[in-house]
């Protein structure tokens, strides 16, 4: 078949569009090189996809993308909610060029109240269950801890671990400073403690007035029974709760859980600021910075803001808690998206664009926070991009796209040969990529042999890359001088990798920052960049992060080894008995503090063995 007889890709695409069903689903556009351009969802695939191929498209960016479409794929789903879920997964996994992308963050923290006889409250992050009560989510760990402090002041709930609670014979410091009612030593009845837990839960759900009425009734009842000491304790609770309510902005309407979302677009970047109100209390906010905003399929910043808002709602809430009310600073008409979210969460969502009163103040705060966060990002981004450019120029690297420039840095850490660990940190997209950090436990080497440790970690890291699996960075940064760099060279030669990627950072005289020398293995002479060099500042930032990451891992490993090793050295203490001792006394420190009688009370520990344990630990 001649070139003139070859089928027209556009004709094939239009033919495919004409055959699409009027059903919900997800569509994907590809260019001639089979690169994924865009992923979208639709209630009606045929109607939605056909709209892209109209003659007069409102957005020039959309028209530009449509010109590049060489083929399309579709997946039919049972509902629009299912399409929303699939679209979200594909966007996050495949990262199409024209989709606005919000990077996955850690799950939000919760405040947990356990379902035990004497419940404890705790900071929690992870999947929720039905055995315990969970309140949140909260925008930050700080917000959870602040709420816990309030509950300690007002309701005196315990926060201690169960092993500590079960073995206390006298109240702890928290009871002495009036932050715990002392249920561990029966200073409060089970019924009164349960009432405090119930009131704490009501407070977190926004039923503060009801809690105040309950406490006032309880205080009057104690007074009538001439139990003035108990009445005074309840009065203190009322005063503490009143102070909290006075200090914080409280929502008095019917819906106590609200999310306030403000979007700002400027300079090709966007910021989404999410503020959370839970139980009527404003818990703070969190800023998000999506990528691919400069490729968004919109014609103006106002339209891009709408696209960013839609992308945030779809990607953020698809697997997270959605409150009953959303307050947005960007108006949009997206009934299909909201119906899909409501189907996903199982309850009605009230969307507000023009709030009044307290809610208006909250939206203004969120909007201002977005402006400040975006201004800070643009400022930092400008300086960080400049440093990246300086480093690329200083090393003489040919990088077609500065955004893709990638550095991996290695550091070895140990204490006199104990608990040796190697760390690898990653710099990419002008920022440290925490999610790509890795630690490597180093085994089967002579203690303290940093060269052998470096050889082991580099082999483990790049053996797969040499076999075609994984990504090779533009620079491999080694925290060390000629010896470490020579070991890296040997590994790269062995694996058939480019040795010019290796850059060593030799510490200067007195280990002073700014006096470092860059060491190469491909014939280039050592290079001193100078104290004021932006390139050196970036190298120092990456190297220091690798060192920090290695040190924290090494300390944790060493502490764990020491905690178990002291008990392992005692004859007659196996894994099961060791576990029982640690569980009973809440850790090695508790075992050390225990008396012989306490040790002998543990199942499987005889009097003689208890004496042996006590002697070994003292």
UniProtKB/Swiss-Prot annotation:
It holds the Pfam family UVR. InterPro entries: GIY-YIG_endonuc, GIY-YIG_endonuc_sf, GIY-YIG_UvrC_Cho, Hlx-hairpin-Hlx_DNA-bd_motif, RuvA_2-like, UVR_dom, UVR_dom_sf, UvrABC_protein_C. The keyword DNA damage applies. PROSITE patterns: GIY_YIG (PS50164), UVR (PS50151), UVRC (PS50165). Residues 22-100 form the GIY-YIG domain. It comes from the Bacteria. Gene3D superfamilies: 5' to 3' exonuclease, C-terminal subdomain, GIY-YIG endonuclease, UVR domain, UvrC, RNAse H endonuclease domain. Keywords: Cytoplasm, DNA damage, DNA excision, DNA repair, Excision nuclease, SOS response. It is found in: Cytoplasm. The keyword DNA repair applies. One of its GO terms (biological process) is SOS response. The UvrABC repair system catalyzes the recognition and processing of DNA lesions. UvrC both incises the 5' and 3' sides of the lesion. The N-terminal half is responsible for the 3' incision and the C-terminal half is responsible for the 5' incision. This is UvrABC system protein C.
